[in-house]
């Protein structure tokens, strides 16, 4: 299988988080946005972690691969548990972390990197995965895509 990217999604998330921080340090823009209360940031991070862990657990439960670069080894189609609410809970969890971080940084530029994360992951990770899953699981997967959102 030939995915458009070979960069692991957690690395993309980390790079975006790092760029978010750097952008606040080098920007001449003032911190014009209100900072998220620390409790809100923590809640979003816990929620994001839960999404990711539940997504991994659902894959492990049916013994299918969690490796985003080996989708051809996918043997089971998971549509229960957290996958009833999101087709990509692991990536949505990373997005929650970035929302928490951007809100905590209280600066407009980090939000651009959150948008870049969503666009990049959708184009270079999720869409290629979806093509493989549609090919492998056909009408069942297509029906699932009509019922469940890609992110949240």
Specify the residue positions occupied by each region the protein language model found.
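Membrane-anchoring alpha-helices and their flanking helix-loop junctions
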Residues: 1-80, 92-152
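Extended, alpha-helix-rich binding/interface surfaces that flank or overlap catalytic cores
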Residues: 88
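Solvent-exposed interhelical
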Residues: 83
């Amino acid at each position: 299988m030939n995915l458009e990217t070979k960069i692991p999604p957690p690395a993309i998330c980390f790079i975006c988080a790092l760029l978010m921080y750097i952008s606040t340090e080098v920007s001449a823009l003032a911190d014009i946005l209100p900072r998220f209360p620390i409790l809100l940031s923590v809640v979003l991070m816990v929620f994001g972690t839960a999404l990711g862990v539940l997504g991994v657990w659902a894959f492990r439960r049916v013994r299918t691969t969690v490796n985003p670069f080996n989708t051809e080894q996918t043997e089971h189609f998971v549509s229960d548990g957290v996958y009833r609410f999101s087709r990509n809970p692991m990536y949505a969890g990373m997005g929650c972390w970035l929302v928490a971080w951007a809100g905590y940084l209280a600066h407009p530029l980090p939000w651009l990197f959150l948008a870049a994360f969503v666009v990049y992951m959708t184009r270079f990770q999720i869409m290629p995965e979806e093509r493989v899953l549609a090919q492998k699981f056909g009408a069942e997967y297509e029906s699932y895509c009509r019922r469940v959102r890609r992110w949240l």
